[in-house]
Amino acid sequence: MVSVMNTVDTSHEDMIHDAQMDYYGTRLATCSSDRSVKIFDVRNGGQILIADLRGHEGPVWQVAWAHPMYGNILASCSYDRKVIIWKEENGTWEKTHEHSGHDSSVNSVCWAPHDYGLILACGSSDGAISLLTYTGEGQWEVKKINNAHTIGCNAVSWAPAVVPGSLIDQPSGQKPNYIKKFASGGCDNLIKLWREEEDGQWKEEQKLEAHSDWVRDVAWAPSIGLPTSTIASCSQDGRVFIWTCDDASGNMWSPKLLHKFNDVVWHVSWSITANILAVSGGDNKVTLWKESVDGQWVCISDVNKGQGSVSASITEGQQNEQ
């Protein structure tokens, strides 16, 4: 049974939409409809407010930590159509970059595997996905996939950095031949897989269909050394699917229904070992699921989140924006 280890009083003045631990598990970033992003030191069960970041002009939907090899960097996205990248310098958090290239609410941000460099994917209600790549000297290159999801994009998630056709490291001194991929979920009820071509452009590689309503979240499972790719998806239709691909070409994906919930499912998140999936929904619970030896997914724990639906107002905001 899972127990609550710590409770953090964020002092946000409105609904909290996301909370993310950093790479080392010592800092917690939160964001809220009060337009703020907060960072706490949560070591040893404590909670010390490190930063209260103000820069957005609307509800902040999501935050994402970059890998620490690039420093202490946090991205946030908002209903105000902006993505802000924050960086800690000499103990002080400041805005280092602002991306205002979308025409509607930006709903999701996700950093690419650190092997690729500092790259951020951003999904928006305008249907586009933008990719921000740090090129040095404070400069960011922007590429945009227009009409990625015709009615709006709700979620983005990168595939792990794996060299195609190989389960071992590249020879010493040889640069790995990574193929960059990520998944997106949208209001067209679809999950789409994207791949970077040799010319640097992004191409739709696959379209996964199983949901009957808006896809709310997608999560590409971490690589554990097996020649299998796995993606979890959840939807307004209350269903969670586990998609697997054992095909070397990456084209043959098979969905398995994990569970049909009685309410919308907002978020899915994998454990670092990819054997446990956390599911958060409108039923005010977080459930943990594990695949049994016979291939069936079993609920191993559920935690009641308390009174109120944690993500209810996200729907209202995104629907109004559209």
Swiss-Prot record:
InterPro entries: Sec13/Seh1_fam, WD40/YVTN_repeat-like_dom_sf, WD40_repeat_dom_sf, WD40_rpt
Activity regulation: The GATOR2 complex is negatively regulated by the upstream amino acid sensors CASTOR1 and SESN2, which sequester the GATOR2 complex in absence of amino acids. In the presence of abundant amino acids, GATOR2 is released from CASTOR1 and SESN2 and activated.
Family statement drawn from the similarity comment of this UniProt entry: Belongs to the WD repeat SEC13 family.
Membrane protein topology class: Peripheral membrane protein
GO molecular function, a single term: structural molecule activity
Keywords from the UniProt entry: Acetylation, Cytoplasmic vesicle, Endoplasmic reticulum, ER-Golgi transport, Lysosome, Membrane, mRNA transport, Nuclear pore complex, Nucleus, Phosphoprotein, Protein transport, Repeat, Translocation, Transport, WD repeat
Major localization class: membrane
Quaternary assembly: At the nuclear pore: component of the Y-shaped Nup107-160 subcomplex of the nuclear pore complex (NPC). The Nup107-160 subcomplex includes NUP160, NUP133, NUP107, NUP98, NUP85, NUP43, NUP37, SEH1 and SEC13. At the COPII coat complex: interacts with SEC31A and SEC31B. Interacts with SEC16A. Interacts with SEC16B. Component of the GATOR2 subcomplex, composed of MIOS, SEC13, SEH1L, WDR24 and WDR59. The GATOR2 complex interacts with CASTOR1 and CASTOR2; the interaction is negatively regulated by arginine.
GO cellular component, one term: nucleoplasm
Pfam family, one: WD40
Keyword set includes Glycosyltransferase: no
Organism from which the protein derives: Mus musculus (Mouse)
SUPFAM superfamilies in the record: WD40 repeat-like (SSF50978)
Protein name: Protein SEC13 homolog
Biological process annotations from GO: cellular response to nutrient levels; COPII-coated vesicle cargo loading; endoplasmic reticulum to Golgi vesicle-mediated transport; mRNA transport; nucleocytoplasmic transport; positive regulation of TORC1 signaling; protein exit from endoplasmic reticulum; protein localization to plasma membrane
PANTHER family the UniProt entry points to: NUCLEAR PORE COMPLEX PROTEIN SEC13 / SEH1 FAMILY MEMBER (PTHR11024), PROTEIN SEC13 HOMOLOG (PTHR11024:SF2)
Gene transcribed to yield this protein: Sec13
Modified residues (Phosphoserine): S184, S309
Function: Functions as a component of the nuclear pore complex (NPC) and the COPII coat. At the endoplasmic reticulum, SEC13 is involved in the biogenesis of COPII-coated vesicles. Required for the exit of adipsin (CFD/ADN), an adipocyte-secreted protein from the endoplasmic reticulum.
Sequence ranges of the WD repeats: 11-50, 55-96, 101-144, 148-204, 210-253, 260-299
Chain positions found as N-acetylvaline: V2
